Design a protein with these regions (language model features):
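Acidic, Ala/Val/Gly-enriched low-complexity intrinsically disordered segments
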Residues: 4-6
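Short amphipathic alpha-helix that is part of the acyltransferase structural core
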Residues: 8-70, 77-84, 150-184
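Short, hydrophobic beta-strand segments that form beta-sheet elements in well-ordered domains
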Residues: 33-34, 119-121
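Short coil/turn motifs at secondary-structure junctions
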Residues: 71-73, 93, 126
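Conserved acetyl-CoA-binding loop-helix of GNAT-fold acetyltransferases
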Residues: 85-90, 95-113
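Conserved active-site alpha-helix within GNAT-family acetyltransferase domains
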Residues: 112-117, 123-141
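Flexible glycine-/small-residue-enriched beta->alpha junction loops
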Residues: 136-153
Length: 184
């Protein structure tokens, strides 16, 4: 009896190209991050603009998408370069193959080679942090307070509903804020 040999599946991790857009929109829709609407393209392009993006191909189609952004982090009185992995999205057919982990590791490696002294992961499952050697905060209470003891001044006006027209002003406000130790 001849042994059964699984077919070889071709995989490759490479930089995102505009021609990957259709595959990436499919992945985002598949996992529920997008609705498959016409506006998805614009949202995706805004999300990836000026970011470092990788895809992992499975049999010639992009099935994993990793997006990372660079910036600086305040450490004591210094600014140090960092890179943050903002998202890892994996299609259903590419799951449990290690492709997302390999693409994430490559993104982190490329950031380090390009000068990032600190690497951060966005919110992932706790096991994902541990797999890559990231520390996390403790799970025990360090301090407590009684919320009833807070004395917050009453608003003198109604809150203003912000829209996409306010995006530039909101962004400028965030850029002007004072950064403390650990701030990004």
């Amino acid at each position: 009896k001849r042994p059964v040999v699984a077919s070889k599946i071709s995989t490759m991790i490479r930089p995102y190209k505009p021609s990957d857009l259709k595959d990436c929109l499919r992945i985002f829709k598949e996992v529920g991050w997008m609705d498959g609407e016409d506006a998805d393209k614009n949202i995706f392009e805004a999300y990836t603009r000026d970011a470092n993006c990788l895809v992992a191909e499975l049999d010639g189609a992009a099935e994993v998408f990793v997006v990372a952004r660079t910036g600086s982090m305040r450490y004591l009185d210094s600014e140090i370069p960092f890179s943050g992995v903002c998202g890892v999205v994996t299609s259903h057919v590419a799951r449990q193959r290690g492709l997302a982990s390999k693409a994430t590791a490559r993104s982190i490696k490329e950031a380090a080679l390009n000068g990032a002294a600190v690497s951060m992961l966005g919110m992932f499952d706790q096991g994902y942090y541990e797999k890559f050697g990231y520390g996390s905060t403790t799970y025990h209470r360090i301090s407590t307070f009684d919320p009833a003891s807070l004395q917050v001044p009453k608003l003198s006006r109604s809150p203003k509903r912000l829209t996409s027209k306010d995006a530039e002003a909101m962004h400028n406000c965030r850029c002007r804020r004072r950064r403390y130790h650990g701030g990004c």
